[in-house]
Curated annotation (Swiss-Prot):
One of its GO terms (molecular function) is D-cysteine desulfhydrase activity. It comes from Escherichia coli O9:H4 (strain HS). Belongs to the ACC deaminase/D-cysteine desulfhydrase family. InterPro entries: ACCD_DCysDesulf, D-Cys_desShydrase, D_Cys_desulphydr_bac, TrpB-like_PALP, TrpB-like_PALP_sf. Pfam families: PALP. It catalyses: D-cysteine + H2O = hydrogen sulfide + pyruvate + NH4(+) + H(+). CDD domains: ACCD (cd06449). Its EC number is 4.4.1.15. The gene is dcyD. The modification N6-(pyridoxal phosphate)lysine is found at residue 51. One of its GO terms (biological process) is D-amino acid metabolic process. Homodimer. This is D-cysteine desulfhydrase.
C-alpha cells in the first residue's frame, strides 16, 4: 500500500505515540469471544477521542491557509466540536461552533454539562441554530459572516469528515496493522458509523493492510440506505487523494441506533455498564455504547463472518456521560 502518499499532506503531531490496542480478558470471558479494543478514547487532548486524528490534518491545512479561526458544527454534546475547540485553543486560534439540539430536550444537564461545559472552558464562540438541515451551507454562511468581521475562517465539516480529515483513519489502520502483526489475527473490526470519516478511512486502510478482516460500521443516526452512500462517497474520495483503489464492500448494521441520534437506548446503556463493570473503560450513550451493543448482539446472533477475535474501535465520548445523567 503506497502509504508514502500520506506524507504529501501537512499534518500536526497532536497524538504522538500510538494509542493502546488492548485485550479485554474479563469482557472476553463474559462474551465467549476474544475481544480487543483500540483506545482512541485516550488521545491526549480534551479528554480524548477519535476526532483528533482528523484534526491533525485539518488544522495543519488551516494553518497553511493562514486561518485565524476554526468554524465547525454539531450537536450541543458534540465530541467533534469539543476537540476542535481544544485544538483551536492550543494553536491560539479563535473557534466558532454552530450547535443544534437534536433531541429537543430542555434538560439543564444536557444543555450545560458534558461537552458543552468544556466548550466554555475553551472560550468557544457559540452560535445556536434550530437544526443542521444543510450543515455545509450553514457553515459557509457562518464563515461569510465571520470573515466580514475581519477574521480569516477555516471551515471544518461536521465530524471533520471530508477526505482530508479521514486520512487520519487511514493512518490509524496502519497503526492497527503494526500493533496486530505477530500478536493477533483480527477477524472482525467494529466501529461506530456516524459522519462517516472514521469508518471510510478505516475501510480504505484496512482493505490494503488487513484484507482478511471484515469491517462493520454500526450506524448511530441513519439507516443503511441513508448511511451507505455517505461512507462509499468518502471511501472513494480518500482513495482518489491517495491514488489507491478502494473496492472493499462497506458493511453496515443499523439495528442499534433507535429511537434516533443522541437518544440513549437500553441496549446501548447496558453495553456502557458492562464495559465499565468488567474492564473499567467508559463508553458513551451516543456512539460507542450503541456500537458495542451491536458487537454484543452480533456475537449472540452469529452475525460475524466467523468466531475469530474482534477489535472494537473506541472513538471516545465519555464526557457526554455527564450530560446524559440520569439515563446513565
Amino acid at each position: 500500500m503506497p502509504l508514502h502518499n500520506l506524507t504529501r499532506f501537512p499534518r500536526l503531531e497532536f497524538i504522538g505515540a500510538p494509542t493502546p490496542l488492548e485485550y479485554l480478558p474479563r469482557f472476553s470471558d463474559y462474551l465467549g469471544r476474544e475481544i480487543f479494543i483500540k483506545r482512541d478514547d485516550v488521545t491526549p487532548m480534551a479528554m480524548g477521542g477519535n476526532k483528533l486524528r482528523k484534526l491533525e490534518f485539518l488544522a495543519a491545512d488551516a494553518l497553511r491557509e493562514g486561518a485565524d479561526t476554526l468554524i465547525t458544527a454539531g450537536a450541543i454534546q458534540s465530541n467533534h466540536v469539543r476537540q476542535t475547540a481544544a485544538v483551536a485553543a492550543k494553536l491560539g486560534l479563535h473557534c466558532v461552533a454552530l450547535l443544534e439540539n437534536p433531541i429537543g430536550t430542555t434538560a439543564e444537564n444536557y444543555l450545560t454539562n458534558g461537552n458543552r461545559l468544556l466548550l466554555d472552558l475553551f472560550n468557544t464562540q457559540i452560535e445556536m441554530c434550530d437544526a443542521l438541515t444543510d450543515p455545509n451551507a450553514q457553515l459557509e454562511e457562518l464563515a461569510t459572516r465571520v470573515e466580514a468581521q475581519g477574521f480569516r475562517p477555516y471551515v471544518i465539516p461536521v465530524g471533520g469528515s471530508n477526505a482530508l480529515g479521514a486520512l487520519g483513519y487511514v493512518e490509524s489502520a496502519l497503526e492497527i496493522a503494526q500493533q496486530c502483526e505477530g500478536a493477533v489475527n483480527i477477524s472482525s473490526v467494529v466501529v461506530a458509523s456516524g459522519s462517516a470519516g472514521t469508518h471510510a478511512g478505516l475501510a480504505v486502510g484496512l482493505e490494503h493492510l488487513l484484507p482478511e478482516s471484515e469491517l462493520i460500521g454500526v450506524t448511530v443516526s441513519r439507516s443503511v440506505a441513508d448511511q451507505l452512500p455517505k461512507v462509499v462517497n468518502l471511501q472513494q474520495a480518500i482513495a482518489k487523494e491517495l491514488e489507491l483503489t478502494a473496492s472493499a464492500e462497506i458493511l453496515l448494521w443499523d439495528d442499534y441506533f433507535a429511537p434516533g441520534y443522541g437518544v440513549p437506548n437500553d441496549e446501548g446503556m447496558e453495553a456502557v455498564k458492562l464495559l465499565a463493570r468488567f474492564e473499567g473503560i467508559l463508553l458513551d450513550p451516543v456512539y460507542t455504547g450503541k456500537a458495542m451493543a451491536g458487537l454484543i448482539d452480533g456475537i449472540s446472533q452469529k452475525r460475524f463472518k466467523d468466531e475469530g477475535p474482534i477489535l472494537f474501535i473506541h472513538t471516545g465520548g465519555a464526557p457526554a456521560l455527564f450530560a446524559y445523567h440520569p439515563h446513565v
